[in-house]
Amino acid sequence: MGSNYIVIEGLEGAGKTTARNVVVETLEQLGIHDMIFTREPGGTQLAEKLRSLVLDIKSVGDETITDKAEVLMFYAARVQLVETVIKPALAKGTWVIGDRHDLSTQAYQGGGRGIDQTMLATLRDAVLGDFRPDLTLYLDVTPEVGLKRARARGELDRIEQESLDFFNRTRARYLELAASDASIRTIDATQPLEAVMNDIRTTVTAWIKEQGA
C-alpha cells in the first residue's frame, strides 16, 4: 500500500485535534510511521498569510471581505499547499494527515454562505483537477455543542463568530456531501470521547484493510 491523504473535517468544536491524534496512533499501530500534518488554510508561508487575512477579524480593518473573495483566498491557500507540500510528500511515500481540505469550502461556503454549488465545484475542478483525499473523516456535531466547545477554547475567529443558522446550513451541507461520497466516513462526535475515539480507530483500521494494506 502506498502513501495516502487522510483529512479530518467538521464544524468548530468537533474534536479534529483529538481525531488527528487517534489517526496517528492507529497508523503507527499498523506500522505506518512516515507522515506529515497539514492544516487549511495554512501550511506554507503564503497560505499562512492568507489564513490570517481570511480568519482574523481585524486583518482588513473595517473592510468587508466579500463571499467570493473569501472563496478565492481559500483556494489560493489550498492549491499552494497541495502543489508544494501535499503532492511532493505523497510522491515520496509519506502519508499526509490534514486538518480540513476542500470539503470545508463546499460545506461552509456552499452551505453556510449559500454560494452557488455548481460554481464551487467548477472552481474546485479548475484549481485542483482530480486531486482528492483518499479518506475523509467527517466528525458530525451539532452547532450548539460544537460552538460551546469552541468558545471554551477562547476567542473565536471571523468565521467562528457566524450565526447558528450559518452553522446549521454548513452542517446540513456536510451531511449531504458525506452521504453522496463513499470516501467520506461520518463519525458521531456527540458521543462520549472514548466512543468517538473507538469509532475513529475502527473506521481507519477497516479502511486500510479495504485498501489491501
From Swiss-Prot:
InterPro entries: P-loop_NTPase, Thymidylate_kin-like_dom, Thymidylate_kin_CS, Thymidylate_kinase. HAMAP family: Thymidylate_kinase. The gene is tmk. It comes from Citrobacter koseri (strain ATCC BAA-895 / CDC 4225-83 / SGSC4696). Phosphorylation of dTMP to form dTDP in both de novo and salvage pathways of dTTP synthesis. Belongs to the thymidylate kinase family. Gene3D superfamilies: P-loop containing nucleotide triphosphate hydrolases (3.40.50.300). Keywords: ATP-binding, Kinase, Nucleotide biosynthesis, Nucleotide-binding, Transferase. Pfam families: Thymidylate_kin. It catalyses: dTMP + ATP = dTDP + ADP. The keyword tRNA-binding does not apply. ATP binds at residues 10-17. GO terms for molecular function: ATP binding; dTMP kinase activity. This is Thymidylate kinase. PROSITE patterns: THYMIDYLATE_KINASE. It is an enzyme of class 2 (transferase). GO terms for biological process: dTDP biosynthetic process; dTTP biosynthetic process; dUDP biosynthetic process. GO terms for cellular component: cytosol. Its EC number is 2.7.4.9.
